[in-house]
Amino acid sequence: MAQTLSFNGRRRVRKFFGKIPEVAEMPNLIEVQKASYDQFLMVEEPKGGRPDEGLQAVFKSVFPITDFSGASMLEFVSYEFEPPKFDVDECRQRDLTYAAPLKVTLRLIVFDIDEDTGAKSIKDIKEQSVYMGDMPLMTNNGTFIVNGTERVIVSQMHRSPGVFFDHDKGKSHSSGKLLFAARVIPYRGSWLDIEFDAKDIVYARIDRRRKIPVTSLLMALGMDGEEILDTFYTKSLYKRDGEGWRIPFKPETLKGAKAITEMVDADTGEVVVEAGKKLTPRLLRQLSDKGLKALKAGDDDLYGNYLAEDIVNYSTGEIYLEAGDEIDEKTLGIILSNGFDEIPVLGIDHINVGAYIRNTLSADKNENRQDALFDIYRVMRPGEPPTMESAEAMFNSLFFDAERYDLSAVGRVKMNMRLDLTVEDTVRILRKDDILAVVKMLVELRDGKGEIDDIDNLGNRRVRSVGELMENQYRLGLLRMERAIKERMSSIEIDTVMPQDLINAKPAAAAVREFFGSSQLSQFMDQVNPLSEITHKRRLSALGPGGLTRERAGFEVRDVHPTHYGRICPIETPEGPNIGLINSLATFARVNKYGFIESPYRRIVDGKVTNDVLYLSAMEEAKYYVAQANAEMNPDGSFVDEFVVCRHAGEVMLAPRDSMNLMDVSPKQVVSVAAALIPFLENDDANRALMGSNMQRQAVPLLRAEAPFVGTGMEPVVARDSGAAIGARRGGVVDQVDATRIVIRATEDLEAGKSGVDIYRLQKFQRSNQNTCVNQRPLVTVGDVVNRGDILADGPSTDLGDLALGRNALVAFMPWNGYNYEDSILLSERIVADDVFTSIHIEEFEVMARDTKLGPEEITRDIPNVSEEALKNLDEAGIVYIGAEVQPGDILVGKITPKGESPMTPEEKLLRAIFGEKASDVRDTSMRMPPGTYGTIVEVRVFNRHGVEKDERAMAIEREEIERLAKDRDDEQAILDRNVYGRLIDMLRGQVSIAGPKGFKKGTELSNAVVSEYPRSQWWMFAVEDEKVQSELEALRGQYDESKSRLEQRFMDKVEKVQRGDEMPPGVMKMVKVFVAVKRKIQPGDKMAGRHGNKGVVSRIVPVEDMPFLEDGTHVDVVLNPLGVPSRMNVGQILETHLGWACAGMGRQIGELIEAYKANGNIEPLRKTIGDVVGAGPKAEQVHEFDDDSVLRLADQWKRGVSIATPVFDGANEGDVNDMLRLAGLKDTGQSTLYDGRTGEQFDRQVTVGYIYMLKLNHLVDDKIHARSIGPYSLVTQQPLGGKAQFGGQRFGEMEVWALEAYGAAYTLQEMLTVKSDDVAGRTKVYEAIVRGDDTFEAGIPESFNVLVKEMRSLGLSVELENTKLDEAQANQLPDAAE
C-alpha cells in the first residue's frame, strides 16, 4: 500500500504510547440508536418477508379485528412507507417533523352466517391501502427532527421481565426475621407476588392487591389439597410392627442431627446408634452400606408428623382424617381403631423441609376450586357478585391470555434460567408449572437452599432502546383505535364499506406525536459540541415511564455494580439528584436482541489468548474467569505469570493461569467515550474524573479549533461517529470545492441508476440547539484522490478530523497576587487579542404576522412614530439586511398591529369618508433586539402562507435558493456528461461507422479527431458495424437519458417545494426568522476547565507584559493555583502539563529543522528527528515509510507541538514522560525558571510550566449578568419576577433583611420591603415624585400583606384592620421599645 496516498495532511498523526494491541474494532458509537430504530421500522425489508418484530409485530398483535357479532373481520396484510415529503434540512428550516407517511394494506372479510347452523361462509373480500399517519424517521446521526428541533430518544434501563426472589432484609418484622418473597414480572400484564408472612404462611398477591393464601391460587389452577401436598412433599410409609412402627431409614434427611434416643434396626433389633451421638455423613454412609433399611419407632415418635393422604373407609366412603392433619394421640387412636396398619406420612422434619405449604393449606378457608376462584374475583373486583363463569374468565385473563399477558421472549428466557425449565421462548404466558416452580423455589429458599437475586445485577436489568419504546407507544395507539373500529364495524352497513371508512388513524398518530413531543425520554438534544451529542445518544436512564423516580431510588440502584464492568461507565454520571440513575454506555458495549448489555472478550484456548472476540452479557459472563487486558503475555499468547489477576462471579482475585477462559479486549472498554478522552485518567481521583468527563460536554466550539497535543487516540473516532466531520461515502476524485459544498466524482460503487457524483453540502454558521455555532470547513483541494471514510471537511470542534474541544495553553502553576484564590484563573491579554478562546453564538428571533379580529398585522417598513435613523438597517419590506451590526433596542423586523376602534365624531367620519384611512389606528409591535445582545445578522428566512402575496425580500431569498439548486444540477450534469461522453468516445474509437450526423461519410473508421468535429449532442447519431458495441452504445444512451431526466425531475421537485407556500400555524399569515451571530471573547466571569475536573472562573485578564515569562522571553498564557492539585488528587493534569511541555519542545526543534531544510534542502535530519519522536511500535511503521512530501506535511503539522496519544489505563508512564522531556532537550523535572513580568526579577523557586488543554465552558458571564430597573410583576403578590429570562429583579431575602437590621438602616429597609417591591400605589408615587424632581414619598401597605390577610380570611379568621388615630395619652401608654 503506497503511503503517499494515505497521508495528505488531512488527518492528524499522533505518536502512540499504548502497548496493548487493539484486537476488536470499536462498534460505531451511535449504533445503539440506529440499529434499534431500523429493527422497529424495517424499511429495507421486503413487504412480504418481514419477521414478527417491531412494527410488524404491533400490527399482528392488534389485527385481525372482528366485530361483536363475528360477521366481519379486518385483517392486516402489510405496511409500507412512502418517501418523506421534506428532507432533513427543509424540516429544520420550516419547523416540521421529519417523517414518512405510513400506508397499511388491510383486508376486510365479510361473512355469511347461516341462521340455523351458525356456519360461516365468506361473502366478500376487499383489500385497500390505508394512510395511518406519519412515522418519524431517524436522521443519519441517530436523532429525530420534531417540529424543526433535533431530539434524542434516550434508552431506558428497567427491570427485566422474569421471576425474582428476594427478602425484606429483616425490616418488616420486629424480630428481624427474613421474610422471603418471589415476584413474577411480565413485560405487560398483572404482577404476581408470592410471599411469606411472619408466621411462615405463604400468601399470593395479584397486582399488589389484598393477599390470599397461595393454596387458594393453586386450587384455582385446578389442584386439590392432597395434590398440593403431593407436589411439595415426599411421602414415607410408616408400617405397624408389633407394638411399634417400622419407619424407612433416609440418611439424606438426618445429616448433622443428633440421636435423642437410641436408634434400633427394625429388622435385626440391634442398636445401631447410641443416644446422644451425632449423625455425621460418614456414620450415615456406613449405616447405608451395612444395609440398614428401616428403624424401629414407638407411638410417640409418630406424634407431630402429618398425614400425606386422606384416611378413608373405602366401603362407606367415610373420611376419618384428611391429608395434612397432624398425628397426635387422638388421631392415632382413630387410625388404629379402624384397623389401618400403614400410615402415609409427609416428609416434613422442620429442619430440612418446613411445613409451610401444609400450614398454609390448613389456614386456608377455601375448600375447593370454586371458593378459590370467587375469592380471587372478590380481591380483583371488589363489590361485584361473582359467578362461576365470570370468575373463571377473569382468572384466565390474568395470566393465561396472550392478549392481556405477555412475558416477552426475555421474560421466558430469564424464567427458564432461574427455574431450570426448558420452555420455548414463544410461550409468552404463564403456565401452571411455572407458578408451581416459583412456589417450590421460594419454599426451598425459606428452607435455606439457594440464593436470592441481586436486582442491581445487569443480568436482571435490561435496556429499552428507541425501537422498543416506540413499539409500546404505537401499540397503545392501535389499541385505542381498535375499540373505535369495533364499534364502527357493528354500527355501519358492512357490505358497502371499504377498510378506509372503518379506520380513523388519529389515535395512532396522536400516540406517536405524544411520545416524541412530551415523553420524559424524548429529550431536546444536547448539541453544545460533537461529544455532548454522542454522549446524549449513548445515555441510559433509569427514570421515565415504567422506571424509577428520583425520590424513591435508594443507594443500591445508583451504586456501581461489578457487572457494570465493560458495560456501563463507572465514572460518567451527573452530579446531583440524578447521580447513578443516568449512566453512559461503555466504549465497546453493545445491546443484544434481548436488551441486555454485552461486552467483548478474547477467547483463551489451551492457555493461549486468541484474537477471536466474543460478546457476552452479564449473566453469561458470571461463569468465566476473565483476565485483565493488561495481563503480561509471552509472544505466543500465553501468560507470563503463574497466577493472573482476574474477575470471576463479581470478585477480583488471583487465579492460576490455566483456569482463565477469557480476557478483556482493551483497557478502555471499562469507561465511556467522554472518560476515554481524558489522558492520564488512571492518575485522577474518580470524583474529579467524573467532573472532567461531564465538563468536556459543556465545552463551547471555539473560533479556531485546535486538537490537543496530549490526546488519547479516541479523538478521531468521536469526530467521525458524531457526524461533525464529514467522511467520504465512497472513493473518488475531488472535482469542485468551495466553502459551502464539495463535489466528488465517484470511482467506486458505480452501479447503474446510482449517480456517479457525490455532492456534500457543508453547514455554514447554523445555530445548534444550545445556540452554539455549527460551521463546516473543507479540508480537500481539487484533484485530491479520496478513499471511503476519509475526512473531507472539519465541523465544529474538530481539527483535521480530530475532536478539538479547546486550545493548548501555556500554563504556570504558581500563586499570582491572590488572583488565583479559590480556583480562579488568571489569563494573559494575548489570549483575548489573538481570539484564542473566542466563540461564535447564534441566536434566533422569530416574528409572526397574524390575522387578528381587528384586521391583519403587517410586516412593513412604514412604522408610526419611528425615526428614519431607527429604520436604517431595514429593507423596503421592513426586514433587517444580512450583515447589519445590531445592538439592544434595534428593530429587526418592522410590524404594525391594528388598534381597537375608538368611537368617531361625525366630523371625523366625514373627513375619513373624504380622505380615506388614517394612519393612527395601528400600533408599533416591531421585534427589537433584547437588552444585552449585540451581534451581526447572518441569515434571514421569510415564510408565507399559501396564497399570501410574497414581498420583495421573500422573492429574493427564493431566487437565491433556486440558483443554488440550479448550480448543483448543472455541476452534476457536467460531471455526468464528461463521464458518459468520455465512455462514448472510447467505445467509438477504432470502430467502422455505418451511420452518422448529416454530411458524414459512411464506412469511415472513427477516431477522436473525426468525432470531435461534431458537437457532442450529435455523437449519438454515429452507428457502428460491430453489433455488440452498437448494443452497448444504445444501453449507454438509455442510461444517460434516464440519469438526465431523473436529475431534471429532482430539480423541478425541489424548485416546486421552494416556490409553494409554507404550512403555518392557524391564524399566521407570515413568519420571519432572523439569526444574529454574536462573537464572545473570553472575559472575567467566564468559566474554564481542563480535562481533569480542574474548573475555575476567569478572575482577571492581565496585560501580556505583566505576566510571568520564561528565560527565552515567552510569556505564559494562564496562571493556575498549585493548591488546586493536592487536595483534589487529579494528578493527571500535572502529567499532562509535563508531556505537553515536551511536545512543544519537540515542535520547536522540528520548526528549526524545517527552516534548515528550506535553507539547505537536506531533509534527512528532519526525517530522523520525526523518526526518533515516533519511535517503534505498530502505529509508527507507516510514518517511517513516508515520502518527502508527507514528511514535510507532517513536520508542518507538528511544528507548534507534537501530537501524541496516551490511551487510558495503557498510556505513558513517568519514565515515558521523562524520556520525552530529554528528547526535547528539556530538564526532566519539568520545571523552569520564571521571571516576574512586572519587576523583571526572577522568582525564588522553579515553577512547573507546560501545556494544558483548556476548555471554555458554556457558562458565559454574558448569559448570566443582568440588570433591571422596571419590569414585569407577579400577578398575585405584585412582587417583581425573578430570573434573567423573565427580566426579573434581585431577591432581597431574609438574610439581607438581617443585614440591614444590623446596620439599623430602617428607612432603607422600609423602602426595600414596600416601594421597591410590592407596594403598588407607593411605587407609582415614587415614580411621579422622581419625575417631578422631588424626593419625598410615603410607603404604604405591601401587597403581600393583603395576600396574607386574604389567606387568613379564607381559613375563616376574621382579620380586620382598624384605622384609628391615637391621641397623646394613648400613645404614652404604649410600651416603650427601648425598655
From Swiss-Prot:
Subunit (UniProt): The RNAP catalytic core consists of 2 alpha, 1 beta, 1 beta' and 1 omega subunit. When a sigma factor is associated with the core the holoenzyme is formed, which can initiate transcription.
Cellular component GO terms, alphabetical: DNA-directed RNA polymerase complex
EC number per UniProt: 2.7.7.6
Similarity comment text for this entry: Belongs to the RNA polymerase beta chain family.
Keyword Nucleotidyltransferase recorded: yes
Coiled-coil residue spans: none
Function: DNA-dependent RNA polymerase catalyzes the transcription of DNA into RNA using the four ribonucleoside triphosphates as substrates.
Classification via SUPFAM superfamilies: beta and beta-prime subunits of DNA dependent RNA-polymerase
InterPro entries found in the cross-reference section: DNA-dir_RNA_pol_bsu_ext_1_sf, DNA-dir_RNA_pol_bsu_external_1, DNA-dir_RNA_pol_su2, DNA-dir_RNAP_su2_dom, DNA-dir_RNAP_su2_hyb_sf, RNA_pol_bsu_bac, RNA_pol_bsu_CS, RNA_pol_bsu_protrusion
BP terms from Gene Ontology: DNA-templated transcription
Protein's name according to its UniProt entry: DNA-directed RNA polymerase subunit beta
Domain of life: Bacteria
EC category: transferase
Annotated catalysed reactions: RNA(n) + a ribonucleoside 5'-triphosphate = RNA(n+1) + diphosphate
Record flagged with keyword Disulfide bond: no
Gene3D superfamilies, sorted: 2.40.50.100, 2.40.50.150, 3.90.1100.10, DNA-directed RNA polymerase, beta subunit, external 1 domain (2.30.150.10), DNA-directed RNA polymerase, subunit 2, domain 6 (2.40.270.10), RNA polymerase alpha subunit dimerisation domain (3.90.1800.10), RNA polymerase Rpb2, domain 2 (3.90.1110.10)
Species assigned in the record: Rhizobium etli (strain CIAT 652)
Keywords: DNA-directed RNA polymerase, Nucleotidyltransferase, Transcription, Transferase
GO molecular-function terms, A-Z: DNA binding; DNA-directed RNA polymerase activity; ribonucleoside binding
